[in-house]
Amino acid sequence: MGKKSLAEQIADIANKPQVEDFDIENDEGVFQHGGSDSDVSSGDESEEELKKQHYVAVGKSKLRNVVDQGLAVKDKKYVGSKGSRAELFNDEEMDAPEQGESESEAESGSEESDAVSFRSDSEDVSESEATSESEIEKDREEDEETAMKKEKLAKIVQTQTKQVINNLAHSAQRDASKGYAILQQNKFFDKILDSRIKLQKALSASNQLPLSQQSWDELLDENNSKLLTSTFKVLEKVLTQCVTVRHKFQIGDHINQSENPSDFDNSKKRSFKELVHETVTLDSDLKSYRSAVLNKWSAKVSASSGKSLLQASKFKAINQSADVQVDNQLADMPRLLKRTKLNRSNTKPLLFDEDLQKGLLKELQLEENVEGDIEEENNLDIPKNYDPRRKDNNALDFTQNPYIYDDEDFYRVLLNDLVEKKISNSQQSNGVTLAITSRSENKLKKNIDTKASKGRKLNYSIQEPIANYEASVNTGYKWSDEQIDEFFAGLLGQKINFNEDDELEADTMHNEEDEEIKNDDIQIFG
């Protein structure tokens, strides 16, 4: 094969693959591929040699010669210290007790060698035994001290565990007593609500009683009088029992500190007025104690819940103490009393209309408003409580009756709380909730006509008939019958002549003129 040209050599170099291909059937190629590691290593060495070809040959440095010859250490700190064999053996015995056997074997070998070394070895052994005994005693003492410390620690731990158990038991007992007291309070409150619910019917029925003494006398008979006397006796008995219980309770809890238990006489018979007076005094004595208790427990509850830390919301009514909330609710007493006089159930006392007509119900009469508006003073025919939106504008508005007591809104709130509490206790797993809504017929709604706006309907009220009224009579001047007849005839467009003679003469003259006209011999139109 001839020599390749320059172009062929350049083409071979350019077309040479980066990864060399190996033929499987070529054994030499496979063998060369298997020994590629050695070739690579030899190639690396040759590459390193090629890299160092330009280096200049340099001999060893002075430091290297010193290291090869060995360092001549002349400083004292590098010189070792001499020691005896006894010290060496003592150190070895302290480090490991098993080395004693090897030392004894070495000592026996040394005794066979020479007597001088035997004497020195025996002295060393005696010294080591003495030191070992002292160390054993020290170890025993240390073990005893550690045992004593452990016993003391165990006793301290036992006493502390007993104290913790006792504290837990006392805290559990306190918590149990508090829980029992709360349960008893809830039961007592439920009983009070139950009695209040039972009294609601009697309270609503009492609003139907007569209002005046005349109606009482008219409706009262023997059976009713007997029933009244019996109920009055029962009421006095219940009031006396309530007063005695409250006296015992307040004296026992040191609420009434001025009184003694012996000063209160249960056997003394009191009148109804005296019982009412005693209840008022008991309420006044209980007020300060109640406010203190409410303030105490509300502060504890707010501290446990973290509400006291929220300074931004302390002025809200719900974040104030319980006694302050109660005082705020009772501050506007006229408004609360006015709400109790609203006739929500539309009850009407017996003989109410008769008493109203007779003027026996003074509180329901219309009062003159001296500071009224000028329009009301000018329009005297319009009642003061006139409302054009109402369907029936009577002179009196009976939706607010001062002779009744109706707290149905407060009663329904209590009833709703009681029922929700019962349901939550009995059916917690089911999560059943009940919302009690008052009936629409029991709600107080104003009788307003919604179609009377924008002039679509003209509302009016019929004026009541005026009593004891008579038109004035002027006796100074009277009309005659002729004037009256002429006046009414003139209204109807007629004219009446009351002179009959003149009328007859006029008739005769008229007849004569007619005859003369007929006989005048003048003929018109043929």
From Swiss-Prot:
Give the compositionally biased regions (Acidic residues). 89-114, 123-145
Give the primary localization class. Answer: nucleus
Record GO biological process: maturation of SSU-rRNA from tricistronic rRNA transcript (SSU-rRNA, 5.8S rRNA, LSU-rRNA)
* This protein's UniProt keywords: Nucleus
What InterPro entries does UniProt report for this protein, alphabetically? AATF, AATF/Bfr2, AATF_C
- Ranges for region Disordered: 16-53, 82-149
What is its subcellular localisation? Nucleus, Nucleolus
Gene Ontology annotations for the cellular component aspect, listed alphabetically: nucleolus
Looking up Pfam families in the UniProt record yields: AATF-Che1 (PF13339), TRAUB (PF08164)
Family annotation (PANTHER family):
AATF PROTEIN APOPTOSIS ANTAGONIZING TRANSCRIPTION FACTOR (PTHR15565), PROTEIN AATF (PTHR15565:SF0)
Question: So what family is this one in?
Answer: Belongs to the AATF family.
**What is the official name of this protein in its record?**
Protein BFR2
